[in-house]
Amino acid sequence: MAKLLLLTALLAPGLLLAAVLGTVLGLWSADFGMGVLALKAGRVLAYLGLAGALIACLLAFRERRLLGIAGVALLFAAGTLGGYLVQERRFTDAPRDVATDLSDPPVFARVLAAERRLAGVSESRPQACEGLVSAPTQVASETAAWALEKAGFTVLGTAPFRVDGRKEGAWFGLTHDVTVRIRPGRTDVRVAGRDNLQVGDEACRLAKAVVAELTP
């Protein structure tokens, strides 16, 4: 009985691992792997695992030899559910397309625009991001490329007055595109996600990271 309850506590972490591996291997999309398996089914299993762990702890009070199994079950269950609760607070409703200049936002290079169309991303207009402002300086394209790399992006192309890049997440491969537009006296940044998943203020965070590297 106790071993079965331990297995119940391990279901959510196991499903999370399967969701990540399946997405990385291309067995299913990030929307399904993260949105359905990890965030929806995994959350249900996390609560089920915690219930199983608590039952195992009650059994351990009667049979001391079950203390080890109960402790392991509670550790996994509490850690997994805690992770989900933290993610719920992070994954708030936030813009997935942000820019430092909303009146005249930078546009993505043709290669990025083509990739976004092939990925089925619909056209969107950047929205405001609290605290995101342009860099009040004209930087060299090499400096902009360096800033993108420091912020975790892969540089895809550079030109005298622009740099473009892409960043893929380590777990589910969620992709964010970035473009840096360079003009006299200011440098603007735009970051937009490709996936339909709501991952909180990730686009805003990445854009701020790029601007921080551009600002002396």
Describe each region flagged by the PLM.
Residues 14-17, 47-57, 74-78:
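Hydrophobic alpha-helical transmembrane segments of multipass integral membrane proteins
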Residues 1-27:
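Membrane-anchoring/interfacial helices and their immediately flanking loops
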Residues 23-35, 39-46, 55-69, 79-216:
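Ser/Thr-rich, low-complexity intrinsically disordered terminal regions
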Residues 2-10, 61-77:
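Interfacial segments of alpha-helical transmembrane regions
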